[in-house]
Design a protein with these regions (language model features):
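Mature catalytic core of soluble alpha/beta enzymes
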Residues: 2-353
């Protein structure tokens, strides 16, 4: 496992070339983006970290400094939780798998704890020890269909129960075959870090977008809602708009990363029980929650579980969701029933669940 880990980390430098794409490409392909009509006067900042562009718009006194602080907070988080970053908490846990408990940053511990709760509650539909399988598919760099025998041989290593968290702030992977990949929770956690920076800076309101996750802090003037566009799975345009108050949204969609081999299209949302892309009848799931890390983890879990089996999970974590099915129908949980406005004629609002 460590040999595979070391091979993949050598690709890290190539990711940095994405920064040359320019700010004009930031929204292209984003799962969620904000319609920023908050009365003007906002400070905008676009940076790059965690394999994604980070877009911010911050309002109020000290907005520019707050945006810089939030950007730094996201970079600091990446240096803690990215398995690609040498000596990060996650890289250390992976390298020391099967060994002693490791001291980790409280922020890392909290994210792992949130992720582990979703692993347990979803029955493993979400599993942060998916790394041996996700590295094998290599959707970020050289996506390909692995040999079935290789997938089968690595599946036993996917087992979230091998992650142990202690109250003293330490953590360990009990099996030497285990490895962590927080890609399915990291963008939401980055939104958490940014919003915490806004709170500390005392700004009036702010919005941040990291990959498929959005964090909204504070209220717009006159009680207006924030307008968040949801991507049409078929295009880079908007499917519709969600009107929300402070909170966090994350989308997991099969269109985000995919490749076609021998006439078959494979997406990056892997089912931990099979090692292959999840086939749950969904195109995407957008989850609203009070935590970015939680919304990110839940969106992945719900995509793997499918619509019906997701509902108890969402209720357990007091979260809401928008489901888009392969039949081009849109379902909303009751908390979002009046929050979504459909703008695409290619999809149908099928009701609430």
């Amino acid at each position: 496992m460590k040999k595979l880990f070391n091979r993949i980390t050598e690709k890290q430098a190539r990711v940095l070339t994405l920064c040359l794409l320019g700010a004009a490409a930031v929204l292209l392909g984003a799962a969620l983006w904000l319609n920023l009509r908050a009365g003007g006067g906002g400070t905008t900042l676009t940076t790059y970290a965690m394999g994604s562009y980070i877009q911010q718009t911050v309002y109020g006194a000290g907005a520019e400094e707050a945006a810089q602080q939030a950007s730094s907070a996201v970079t600091e988080l990446e240096n803690l939780i990215s398995w690609r970053v040498e000596d990060s908490d996650i890289a250390t846990l992976n390298q020391e798998a099967g060994g002693e408990f490791q001291d980790i940053d409280p922020q890392t511990w909290d994210i792992l704890n949130t992720a582990l709760q979703v692993c347990q509650a979803s029955g493993g539909a979400f599993d942060i020890t998916i790394a041996p399988i996700s590295w094998l598919w290599d959707f970020d760099e050289e996506p390909h269909l692995p040999q079935a025998s290789t997938i089968e041989s690595l599946l036993p290593a996917v087992d979230y129960t091998q992650l142990s968290l202690q109250e003293d702030g330490t953590a360990a992977l009990r099996s030497s075959s285990s490895a962590l990949d927080l890609g399915a929770v990291g963008k939401g956690a980055a939104c958490d870090a940014a919003v915490a920076a806004y709170q500390e800076a005392g700004v009036e309101r702010a919005v941040v977008s990291v990959g498929g996750s959005v964090g909204v802090y504070g209220e717009k003037p006159f009680g207006q809602k924030w307008q968040v566009s949801v991507r049409n799975p078929d295009t880079d345009g908007a499917l519709g708009v969600l009107s929300v108050s402070s909170g966090f949204l994350s989308t997991s969609g099969s269109y985000e990363k995919q490749f076609t081999e021998d006439g078959v299209t494979y997406h990056h949302l892997l089912d931990p029980s099979t090692g292959y892309p999840a086939d749950s009848g969904l195109l995407s799931v957008t989850v609203w929650s009070s935590s970015g890390a939680l919304s990110d983890a839940l969106s992945t879990a719900c995509f793997v579980l499918g619509l019906e089996d997701s509902l108890p999970l969402l209720e357990q974590f007091d979260s809401q969701a928008l489901f888009i099915t392969q039949e081009r129908q849109i379902y909303l949980t009751s908390g979002l029933e009046d929050a979504f406005t459909l703008s695409s004629g290619d999809y149908t609002l099928a009701g609430t669940v």
